[in-house]
Design a protein with these regions (language model features):
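N-terminal targeting/trafficking signals and adjacent low-complexity tails
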Residues: 1-190
Length: 190
């Protein structure tokens, strides 16, 4: 498979501000400390200090959230590494969406992992990816649907409160509808 890089501006999906920031436009330089490149990340890493109490709280919270889940060896290794004062994190996240949301959500996850691995090699220090899901800060109507092409698939209901605690009543019908739109063949599994 041939890889063809597409520059951010060519996608037409990012504002001029984002494109200017990523290209290093001098007029924006006063608004951030470190450039969004490997040298900027290296400089930022050298300045970061994580309070021991905050680090312990993060590890304890992650272990609690993973309770009852069989963890992949890499996750176990990263949790143990997070306890060390020298370990850094690449932290990103996303607002919860039906079916994970746009494709850039898994892309964000994979890039956080890749960046953590790259920085571990470049810095000579362990860097662990941390991804948070914003499940508590928005209303159901913001996340109860997905667009599959021009077809809107919607999860019916009106439950209130934190989205992360809502019952999954009716979700099977939504999944079935998505399968009907996408198809159930081998290509749909990709």
């Amino acid at each position: 498979m041939q890889r063809i890089p597409v520059p951010y501006p060519a996608t037409g999906r990012f504002s001029a501000l984002v494109n200017d920031y990523l290209s290093g436009d001098a007029s924006l330089r006063e608004h951030y400390v470190h450039a969004p490149d490997l040298n900027g990340l290296r400089a930022a890493a050298e300045q970061r200090r994580f309070a021991p109490a905050s680090r312990a709280a993060l590890v304890a919270t992650l272990r609690q959230q993973y309770q009852g889940v069989e963890l992949h060896e890499a996750v176990q290794t990263n949790l143990a590494a997070l306890e060390a004062d020298s370990t850094l994190t690449v932290t990103t996240g996303h607002q919860l969406c039906l079916f994970t949301g746009p494709l850039y959500v898994p892309f964000k996850l994979l890039n956080a992992i890749r960046l953590a691995n790259t920085l571990t090699a470049q810095l000579g220090r362990k860097v662990v990816p941390v991804f948070w899901m914003a499940t508590e800060d928005h209303d159901r109507y913001e996340i109860d649907h997905a667009w599959l092409g021009d077809q809107k698939v919607q999860w019916p209901g009106s439950a209130g409160g934190p989205v992360g605690r809502m019952p999954l009543t009716g979700i099977k019908a939504v999944i079935d509808e998505a399968v009907a739109v996408l198809g159930a063949g081998e290509a749909a599994r990709e």
